[in-house]
Amino acid sequence: MIKDNDNSKVALITGTSSNLGINIAYRLLEQLPSSTNVTLIVTSRTLPKVKEVITNINQYSKTKLNRTGQLEFDYLLVDFTDMVSVLSAYYDLNKKFKKIDYLFVNAAQGVYSGIDWVAATKEICRNPMEGVTNPTYKTQRVGVKSNDNMGLVFQANVFGPYYLIHKIKHLLQKGGRIIWISSLMSNPKYLSFNDLQLLKSPESYEGSKRLVDLMHFGTFKQLQSEYGIEQYLVQPGIFTSFSFFKFLNVFTYYSMLMLFYLARLFGSPSHNISGFIAANAPVTCALGNESQSVKVCSVSNRTGKEYLSYQEVDTTGSADISAYLEKLCHEWDLTLKDQIVNTRQP
């Protein structure tokens, strides 16, 4: 195990097997000083995915980077829609690590049921740029609950990761950085304060990302003042996502890709397409000196050259959201107080 010293860093990336997650790992290794000793904590719901992503990151480091520092891997088998699994992750981290330097909250679970192709055709023909930037034709199931009786998307993308942070603040204190991945689609219209767990929403994924925005603005100042933890909110733009491939065939996939490139060519800065470009804002916030009071966005120009932009966020209701999440944390602390679990069981 790498010794804990000034030249060692520990990074935890949730959803590491996703296109964004693995590219966060690639960029982090590339942008840290080459002599830095790095421990990457890879997360997935399954052991085969963990093994695959570790192999890919290790191969990338050996073939693409000229690193002199050590690279070690650890893993968590964690399902954020299962509170016992989240608690298990906490126990494992607490047992093995004295500090975590970077936590990338890359939770992006949806309950998609497919694509409304008729609506997609109409939307793209009517306004091609809007149709591939803010699509409304991806259909989502309504009312899906987890086995913990919470809104599944709410738990996966918001409360599950929030509860893990609640438990491991002592590992992040005095300099740790938390990077929450938001979305281009986190518009206030997608969230009702009468439905915070998104059980009635036909746009639960987008609503969960609006909750992430509000949660950040309701908590980042307190994390900084009480624990010395810096929290950032980022938006990766539009890029190819592994999770949506199952709804596309070869023709529709390449048609989508062509539309993405055309949108970028005609001036859309949000169509990064590449997961590596999408990872620019998360890694820059982890290593740089960005503002915590705006959303930091990965964007690119017509030729694909990356840069950052900054988005002001409507923070109305942020205090209410943070209070609600803290209340849930207290309730689950009581529920789980006698629970003992083992995260190493695949």
UniProtKB/Swiss-Prot annotation:
Disulfide bonds: none
GO cellular component: endoplasmic reticulum membrane; lipid droplet; mitochondrial outer membrane
Annotated GO biological process: ergosterol biosynthetic process
Keywords: Lipid biosynthesis, Lipid metabolism, NADP, Oxidoreductase, Steroid biosynthesis
Active-site residues, as the UniProt record annotates them: 182, 205, 209
Pathway(s) it belongs to: Steroid biosynthesis; zymosterol biosynthesis; zymosterol from lanosterol: step 5/6
Top enzyme category: oxidoreductase
SUPFAM superfamilies xref list: NAD(P)-binding Rossmann-fold domains (SSF51735)
Keyword hit for Lipid biosynthesis: yes
MF terms (GO), sorted A to Z: 3-beta-hydroxysteroid 3-dehydrogenase (NADP+) activity
Sequence positions that bind NADP(+): 20, 43, 49, 205, 209, 241
Family annotation (Pfam families): adh_short (PF00106)
EC number(s) recorded for this UniProt protein: 1.1.1.270
Catalytic activity as recorded in UniProt: a 3beta-hydroxysteroid + NADP(+) = a 3-oxosteroid + NADPH + H(+)
InterPro entries for the chain: Ergosterol_Biosynth_ERG27, NAD(P)-bd_dom_sf, SDR_fam
Family, similarity comment: Belongs to the short-chain dehydrogenases/reductases (SDR) family. ERG27 subfamily.
Name of this chain's protein: 3-keto-steroid reductase
Organism in which the protein naturally occurs: Debaryomyces hansenii (strain ATCC 36239 / CBS 767 / BCRC 21394 / JCM 1990 / NBRC 0083 / IGC 2968) (Yeast)
